[in-house]
Every structure is written in C-alpha cells, then in structure tokens.
C-alpha cells in the first residue's frame, strides 16, 4: 500500500533555495482568485495532521508554515475571504468560493504564537520556499478517519521523507511555548 502524505512531499521533500524572498499565495479559483502577498521565506514548515488545517484533495496531512504577521498582505479579491471558525484560536481566512485557507491569524496577544500567521506554502505561485522539516499532530489523522492500524506505516513513511513525526509540535516549538508561558507566569507572580 502506498502511503499518501501530501502532494507536495509524496515524491520527496524539495529543498528550498535558501534565498526565497517571498511571493504570492493563490487560491484554487479560476475566476478572480484570492491572492495574498508574503514577504520573506517561511519558518517552521511542517506536515500537520490536525483536523482544522486545510488540505488539498487526497492529502492526509496539510503542509503549513509561519511568517511574521506584518509580512502578509491581501493583494486581490479579499472580498472573497471569510473566517472559517471565529471561535478557533487560529482565525483561518479562507476563500468563500473554493474553500482554500489563505492564511491563519492569532488575535490573542497573550498567545505564544501571536504575531505569526500560518500559511500553506504549496499555494505560492513561485517556487523555492523553505522545505517542510517535521510532522506535527500525527495521531490526529485518526480523528479524520485514518485507521489506527495504518499509523506505523504512516510514521515510517514520514521518517523516510525526513519528516520526524511528533504528536504535538517539534521540540523547538514546544520549548518556545513553554518559555513564553514561564515568562508570562513570572510577570504575573
């Protein structure tokens, strides 16, 4: 059985250029596509198994990365954007017509990732952004209907692709969250 992770990585993870200056994310609409400009390269690019992230058809995982909030600009057809779930921590702005999530924004200034917007690098018109580095929330794909018996094979495929599987975020990101919480707790004490 072939394990499909995501079209952007199924045939191998493509390394970034190391000098990606940014580009334009484009939704899947053929008529009046939403276009979002991104300045600079992405960070913490990863395969995500959560049930909230947008995935293209046939993908088991999404591929998602972050960029500084100030580096995101809606360029065209912003009238087609709507927030998918206003109660979610990450406010995912999606095209009302095709459903593609264009960017996710955290509005809670106390959140460890406030100031970072979440994007799907495969939507770049340009090539060369930083490659996925790991896989997060791997067990969560079971919630979206994957048979738990397939998990060893899926984890093996992720490792084969060079995407270390975690059931939370990568250790560096978990350390950043814990550091933020510790710093905030000390201020409150």
UniProtKB/Swiss-Prot annotation:
Gene symbol of the encoding locus: gfa
EC number: 4.4.1.22
UniProt cross-references to PANTHER family, sorted A to Z: CENP-V_GFA DOMAIN-CONTAINING PROTEIN-RELATED (PTHR33337:SF40), GFA DOMAIN-CONTAINING PROTEIN (PTHR33337)
Pathway: One-carbon metabolism; formaldehyde degradation; formate from formaldehyde (glutathione route): step 1/3
One Pfam family hit: GFA
Domain of life: Bacteria
Catalytic activity: S-(hydroxymethyl)glutathione = glutathione + formaldehyde
Organism: Rhodopseudomonas palustris (strain BisA53)
Listed name of the protein: Glutathione-dependent formaldehyde-activating enzyme
Signal peptide per UniProt: none
């Amino acid at each position: 059985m072939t394990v499909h992770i995501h079209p952007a990585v199924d045939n191998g993870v493509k390394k970034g250029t190391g000098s990606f200056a940014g580009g334009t994310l484009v939704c899947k609409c053929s008529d009046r596509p939403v276009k979002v400009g991104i300045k600079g390269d992405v960070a913490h690019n990863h395969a995500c198994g959560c049930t909230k992230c947008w995935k293209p058809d046939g993908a088991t995982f999404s591929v998602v990365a972050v960029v500084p909030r100030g580096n995101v600009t809606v360029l065209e057809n912003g009238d087609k954007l709507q927030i998918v779930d206003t109660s979610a921590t990450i406010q995912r702005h999606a095209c009302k017509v095709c459903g593609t999530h264009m960017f996710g924004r955290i509005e809670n200034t106390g959140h460890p990732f406030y100031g970072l917007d979440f994007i799907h690098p495969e939507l770049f018109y340009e090539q060369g952004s930083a490659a996925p580095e790991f896989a997060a929330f791997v067990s969560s794909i079971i919630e979206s209907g994957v048979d738990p018996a397939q998990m060893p094979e899926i984890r093996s495929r992720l490792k084969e692709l060079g995407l270390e599987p975690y059931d939370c975020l990568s250790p560096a990101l978990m350390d950043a969250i814990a550091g933020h919480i510790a710093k905030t707790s000390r201020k409150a004490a």
